[in-house]
Amino acid sequence: ISSASAYHKPVCDFRITEGTTLANKYWEYSRNKIACEVVLMKAYRESGFPVTIIRPSHTFCEREAPVGVNGSKGSWQVLKRMLEGKPIIVHGDGSSLWTMTWNEDFAKGFIGLLGNPQAIGEVFQIMSDESLTWNQIYKSIADALGVPFKPYYVSSDFIIATQPEGYDMLGNLIGDKANTVVFDCSKLKRAVPGFQAVVRYEEGVRKCL
């Protein structure tokens, strides 16, 4: 399992396919994923090691409602502020596009590639076709909680400049979530006929809450 964060940042084209260049100077996590891909594909080319590389994007489940920026206590800290009627930090102006994928939808694509001869030596993206702005993402959470969405917009650069010790907002934002991305999963759908992510984010987040 690799990561969609491994794709080139800043993005050259917001439309992302498996052929998009890999390079992320902002996030060590992503560079480590790229290095692992290189090792595995080398083993496939030189010794026939059967490898399939998966690049997911922000897969989530009922255990945690995913957000862009949170404190040491995770996303529940953000939800607590919402319930208290307080504003929440939204990076940038909240207009960049992002993709969230419900874990059961990811699993359908993943299982469809297991033992699939079309998958050997290949790379696949597994994620939802739904693209949402961060404003829409946070508003979905607020709606699920039954409270108003009160954004407090802060530039990613300022968040990075003032981050507490132990945080890596440069990687998390500039290297990942602050970029507008739209993923093309047509390759996966050719290899796994019938694959379709069916759980929309607003439905998934209600399962979390």
Locate predicted features.
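Residue-level signal for the nucleotide or nucleotide-sugar donor/cofactor binding architecture
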Residues: 31, 101, 132, 183, ...
